[in-house]
């Protein structure tokens, strides 16, 4: 974990031997500062649940969709709202939506800890052909 600190994330990358291949940037997940179709993959780890409003979480998912290239993949690991994320990705036209969970022991710990021990990942793939969000709205 990096504690949401870019310097810690860069140190983790250095320890893994990949620091020269990454750039750390802090941004609002509801308004990402990247052009449309910039990335092959988007990875979010224990972040989106921090948006307390479902509409704001939906905006974050829309931003993930916007910055993904066609056929790009999103991996969203979080401690709650998994069904909401899967439904949101489906509304955005993602395919191959999967829930990747933990072992029964970890699931039990999650149940008694209100989810704090068991992030579940939602994986989804952006369709290879799509219409941009901006084109649909205007």
Predicted regions and their residues:
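A short glycine-rich, Lys/Arg-flanked "PGG" loop and its adjoining helix->strand segment in the class I
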Residues: 57-70
């Amino acid at each position: 974990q990096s504690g949401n600190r870019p310097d810690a994330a860069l140190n983790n990358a250095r320890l893994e031997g990949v620091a020269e291949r990454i750039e750390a940037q802090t941004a609002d997940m509801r308004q990402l500062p990247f052009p449309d179709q910039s990335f092959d993959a988007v990875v979010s780890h224990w972040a989106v649940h921090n948006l307390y409003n479902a509409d704001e979480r939906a905006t974050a998912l829309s931003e993930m969709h916007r910055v993904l290239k066609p056929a790009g993949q999103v991996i969203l690991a979080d401690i709650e709202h998994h069904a909401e994320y899967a439904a949101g990705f489906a509304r955005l036209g993602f395919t191959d939506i999967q829930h990747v969970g933990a072992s029964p022991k970890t699931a039990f710990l999650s149940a008694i800890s209100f989810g704090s021990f068991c992030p579940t990942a939602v994986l989804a793939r952006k369709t290879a052909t799509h219409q941009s969000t901006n084109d649909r709205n205007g």
